Amino acid sequence: MDGRNRSNIVPGIEVYVVLKEDQRTGKQTKGIVKDILTRSAYHPWGIKVRLEDRQIGRVQKIC
């Protein structure tokens, strides 16, 4: 599933995100969503979330 639509993302699901420090390389990190930080319904680079381990990144793929 696509990580650009907020309606696809709910707390507790497993996702792949790109962290701020990994934006240049595109390295993806797997984690479980704790909070959704983006307020808009759509974001072209992915919805920003906080993972349960407190890392913040933009959702690239939903597992």
Regions found by a protein language model. Name each.
Residues D2-C63:
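Basic/aromatic-rich interaction segments and small domains that mediate binding to polyanionic partners
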